[in-house]
Amino acid sequence: MKIILLGAPGAGKGTQAQFIMNKFGIPQISTGDMFRAAIKAGTELGKQAKALMDEGKLVPDELTVALVKDRIAQADCANGFLLDGFPRTIPQADALKDSGVKIDFVLEFDVPDEVIVERMSGRRVHQTSGRSYHIVYNPPKVEGKDDVTGEDLIIRADDKPETVLDRLAVYHKQTSPLIDYYQAEAKAGNTQYFRLDGTQKVEEVSQELDKILG
């Protein structure tokens, strides 16, 4: 089962990715997590990515495509995977298709911009695992602490309101065209496309996903 998640930053993709991973036992491939790991390790790619991400800009296609292709070739992706944050542009989608990867489901999470700004300002992240929480919508069991490890949660620099607005502008310009792209792919019989109302409660979105993928 090979799945692509579409939706603006803060649309709830990360939370639902956890549900899909637990339910179907496939790994999540998040380019954001990959780049954050590279940043933490202080690699050259990580330094380049950090400068761009801090400004709310996207990392160039050639860096991202190479990273993802290496990742989906690994053994744990044999039964499928979940792509979150890739592809972000039409050239990336074409590169994925050209590499012979067949996508089974494309899931779009639809949320208005103003809701996303409110959501992301309350987001808290466990840096090591990438687990994501929200102080209102999906709080940790203990305030400020990761449910699994008990370690501190952080506020990412790119969750600040001014950076969120910049990221949304980039999303609408570069990534929104993928909605039309994958709807056309679905009409051609190359994948299945579903749009979900991401303003629903987390549990309601999960139930809808269960019906679609089950």
Swiss-Prot record:
GO molecular function: adenylate kinase activity; ATP binding
Catalyzed chemical reaction(s): AMP + ATP = 2 ADP
UniProt keyword list: ATP-binding, Cytoplasm, Kinase, Nucleotide biosynthesis, Nucleotide-binding, Transferase
EC number: 2.7.4.3
Binding site for ATP: 10-15, 123, 132-133, 200
GO annotation terms (biological process): AMP salvage
GO CC terms in record: cytoplasm
Keyword GTP-binding (UniProt): no
UniProt keyword Transferase, yes or no: yes
Stated family: Belongs to the adenylate kinase family.
NCBIfam families: adk, PRK00279.1-1, PRK00279.1-2, PRK00279.1-3, PRK14527.1
Name of the protein: Adenylate kinase
Species of origin: Haemophilus influenzae (strain PittEE)
